[in-house]
């Protein structure tokens, strides 16, 4: 065992993780970074399936330092992660779920990226195995970016490389009062406080594995916990980012990813009491954070659902949710020579419903998908304006010249 500081501490919180834990730990053993540059802190969170025993067996034969902590079940991933972080000695910390696995070069590449660019957080490309994974942020490798000028706000899971000194300086820890979405809160705050974020898009660093037994911890929990998560993230964003365009761009995330699904196709299956309760939980969030600056950043279907939530129109929302459940496509209505596209979801231009046309109007990013759409941009307007100014200037010049003569 080396006495020098390891480059990276891999923190693994494990609960009923067998047999997935076997491949998880094997992926750490296979890292090209070398055993002298890594350590593992593994916390068995009250497992009964042999997880703790396998961790201890692995610790005895591993070529790098492995610390195993066994404790009673804490009820969620926050406690084990915080405990692992408190024992970490590495310059960097990587949070690895016991169900998942690393690409062989993941740690070496991510540490090199952070060292090269001096960034506090590194995102490594993620691929899903029997489950979906975030995609929109992997278009290009970015040495240095931030949460406002990239799509990283759509990946708020904890499976990233963090500079440990940075986490300690800001006392960043996972909120143990949240049963879901605790990683979103932690990661968003890290993004906002970080001196730069790197995106490693040209190598798959992390394999997000879907469990066949359906016991993946992040998929559990009632709808009330989703509202708790949305509320906490919205409050964090509001506390850390002044009102305006930048805050609106981040608020899209909790509205789109956490809140909108509560009022989607599955809303039609909720009983009357659950529907009423969801509206009650959403009301203070809609009143405080929902406005045009957020709404215009959403696609029409999502914007319409949330508009109806804000207006407390459960009757109309049921029709929209049923339409979503049918998987039908809303008809595009092109007006003003194709420069405006409206999507005819239920109650479009229904006078009795009274929903403004603007709610149904597609923003350019969505409208471009429809044949016949003609985008009016500053670029197309400027030449016309310039020609008009030039003609006016020419007439004035001609008059002055005529009078002088």
Where in this protein do the model-derived segments appear?
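C-terminal subregions of glycosyltransferases and related glycan-biosynthesis enzymes
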Residues: 210-405
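Nucleotide-sugar donor-binding/catalytic module of glycosyltransferases
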Residues: 1-230, 353-355, 359-363, 405
């Amino acid at each position: 065992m080396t006495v020098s500081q390891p480059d990276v501490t891999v923190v693994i919180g494990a609960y009923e993780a067998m047999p997935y834990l076997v491949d998880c730990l094997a992926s750490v053993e296979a890292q090209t970074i070398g055993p002298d540059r890594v350590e593992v802190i593994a916390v068995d969170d009250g497992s009964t399936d042999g997880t703790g025993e396998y961790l201890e067996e692995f610790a005895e034969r591993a070529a790098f330092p492995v610390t195993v902590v066994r404790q009673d079940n804490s009820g969620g991933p926050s406690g084990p992660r915080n405990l692992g972080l408190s024992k970490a000695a590495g310059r960097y910390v990587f949070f690895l779920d016991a169900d998942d696995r690393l690409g062989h070069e993941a740690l070496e590449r991510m540490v090199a990226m952070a060292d090269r660019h001096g960034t506090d957080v590194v995102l490594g490309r993620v691929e899903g195995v029997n489950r979906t994974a975030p995609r929109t942020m992997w278009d290009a490798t970015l040495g240095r970016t931030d949460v406002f000028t990239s799509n990283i706000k759509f990946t708020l899971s904890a499976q990233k490389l963090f500079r440990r000194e940075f986490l300690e300086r800001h006392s960043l820890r996972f909120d143990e009062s949240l049963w879901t979405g605790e990683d979103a809160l932690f990661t968003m705050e890290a993004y906002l406080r970080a001196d730069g974020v790197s995106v490693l898009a040209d190598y798959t660093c992390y394999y997000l594995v879907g469990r066949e037994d359906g016991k993946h911890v992040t998929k559990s929990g009632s709808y009330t916990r989703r509202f708790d998560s949305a509320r906490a993230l919205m409050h964090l964003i509001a506390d850390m980012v002044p009102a305006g365009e930048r805050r609106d761009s981040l608020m899209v995330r909790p509205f789109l990813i956490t809140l909108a699904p509560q009022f989607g196709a599955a809303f039609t299956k909720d009983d009357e009491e659950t529907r009423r309760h969801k509206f009650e939980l959403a009301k203070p969030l809609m009143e405080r954070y929902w406005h045009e600056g957020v709404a215009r950043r959403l696609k029409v279907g999502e914007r319409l659902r949330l508009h109806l939530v804000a207006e407390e129109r459960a009757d109309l929302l049921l029709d929209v949710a049923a339409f979503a459940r049918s998987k039908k496509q809303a008809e595009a209505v092109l007006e003003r020579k194709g420069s405006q596209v409206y999507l005819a979801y239920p109650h479009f231009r229904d006078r009795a419903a009274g929903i403004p046309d603007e709610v149904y109007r597609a923003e350019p990013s969505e409208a471009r998908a429809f044949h016949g759409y003609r985008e009016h941009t500053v670029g197309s307007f400027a030449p016309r304006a310039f020609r008009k100014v030039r003609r006016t200037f020419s007439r004035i010049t001609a008059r002055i010249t005529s009078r002088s003569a």
